[in-house]
């Protein structure tokens, strides 16, 4: 596992997104031993050619983080994870001090009521019932009713709240459900997408619900022993057919890769625990725009599978050139290394 470790200085972790969105730096790796190129995301259309299919993840981050209070006045934080039968799975903090049956209320929205149930998973997940005006909030599409009390959950390494709330959402976000953003897509603007279309490329959308597991590092010595988290995904038939017919498929973000490569190995929708790591093949994706990832993460291992150990040179170059890392950081454009 040491080979997937690298030193990430605190100063390199972006605390706020680039403004405007497409002003973020873009490190371009053309492969085949060619030197790296340094550009900005605004230059992305120059890397796209006629006939490309560019695929984005249109998932939307829900207001899943709720600051609530018990009747006694104690503060409790609830992080909604995903709908389950009769309620939601959620992380509750401080979990051990909140008994099953406890009712929680929001000072921001008196119409919101949360009832904490039993523990349902080894990691402390609890079953909870969410009510708004006495009506159940039963699925992700209904979480818009929580917007007054809830907020988008930011990754634990982002402490700044100086950015506008909408900046942790892509401009094309449509399908509610995620508790984390598909961060490579945060760089794209409507204008940039139109420039890509003007190049004769086609833009297609998939939906992969990004779960809390995306932040979990690999803690075992052998990646083969890592238990990969599962997420829901959907690839429309029209998008699938476009990718099948394309000369080159460009994925925006690792979540898009996971959706497409899961579809290639099974069905066009469902749940996936696909772990793309060294030795994995990429059946659909030819090029990838993605952010710089955490050490020892499954996302970094996906990059290693996609381009080989060249990622180490890319990350070293990025740190030397003061690129910003992680969710609000800069990006890189990679071409698949043929094995």
Question: Can you name each region flagged by the protein language model?
Answer:
Residues 1-339:
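Surface-exposed, charge/polar-rich loops and edge strands
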């Amino acid at each position: 596992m040491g080979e997937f470790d690298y030193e990430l200085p605190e100063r390199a972790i972006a605390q706020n997104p680039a403004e405007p969105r497409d002003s973020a730096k873009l490190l371009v790796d053309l492969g085949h031993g060619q030197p790296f190129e340094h550009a900005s995301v605004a230059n992305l259309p120059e890397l796209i050619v006629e006939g490309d299919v560019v695929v984005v993840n249109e998932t939307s981050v829900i207001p899943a983080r709720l600051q609530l209070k018990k009747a006694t006045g104690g503060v409790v934080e609830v992080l909604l994870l995903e709908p389950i039968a009769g309620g939601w799975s959620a992380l509750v903090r401080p979990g051990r001090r909140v008994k099953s049956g406890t009712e929680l209320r929001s000072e921001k929205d008196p119409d919101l009521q949360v009832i904490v149930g039993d523990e349902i998973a080894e990691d402390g997940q609890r079953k909870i019932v969410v009510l708004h005006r006495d009506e159940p909030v039963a699925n992700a599409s209904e979480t818009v009713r929580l917007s007054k009390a809830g907020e988008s959950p930011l990754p634990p390494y982002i402490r700044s709240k100086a950015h506008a709330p909408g900046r942790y959402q892509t401009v094309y976000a449509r399908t509610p459900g995620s508790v984390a953003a598909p961060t490579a897509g945060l760089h794209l603007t409507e204008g940039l997408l139109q420039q890509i279309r003007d190049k004769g490329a086609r833009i297609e959308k998939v939906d992969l619900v990004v779960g809390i597991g995306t932040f979990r590092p690999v803690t075992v010595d052998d990646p083969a022993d890592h238990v990969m988290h599962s997420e829901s995904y959907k690839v429309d038939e029209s998008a699938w057919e476009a990718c099948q017919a394309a000369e080159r498929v460009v994925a925006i973000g690792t979540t898009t890769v996971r959706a497409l490569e899961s579809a290639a190995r099974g069905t066009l929708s469902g749940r996936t625990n696909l772990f793309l790591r060294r030795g994995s093949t990429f059946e659909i994706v030819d090029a990838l725009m993605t952010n710089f990832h955490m050490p020892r993460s499954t996302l970094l291992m996906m990059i290693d599978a996609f381009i080989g150990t060249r990622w180490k040179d890319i990350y070293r170059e990025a740190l030397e050139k003061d690129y910003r890392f992680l969710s609000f950081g800069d990006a890189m454009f990679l071409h698949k290394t043929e094995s």
